[in-house]
């Protein structure tokens, strides 16, 4: 489906924002609040909420903005043929 291409779009948007000196945060959790968000933004019933994204300037002093999560090695979750 078309929405499956959104990941590449979001990544490209985020890279371009970074190049322009902006920080971003993609937030898939918005999709779990489809009804509330749809009411707030007055979207059509057939629209699907995939995710949200924050864009702006991060506060480097805020501890949450310096969190680095643990990553599994790529060979544990991907196979390249």
Labelled PLM ranges:
Residues 1-40:
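Small-aliphatic-rich amphipathic alpha-helix that forms the alpha element of a beta-alpha
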Residues 45-81:
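C-terminal helix-cap and adjacent tail motif
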């Amino acid at each position: 489906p078309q929405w499956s291409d959104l990941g590449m779009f979001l990544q490209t948007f985020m890279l371009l924002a970074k190049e322009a000196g902006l920080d971003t945060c993609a937030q898939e959790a918005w999709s779990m609040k489809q009804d509330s968000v749809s009411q707030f933004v007055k979207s059509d019933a057939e629209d699907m909420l995939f995710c949200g994204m924050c864009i702006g300037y991060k506060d480097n002093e805020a501890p949450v903005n310096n969190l680095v999560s643990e990553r599994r090695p790529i060979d544990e979750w991907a196979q390249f043929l």
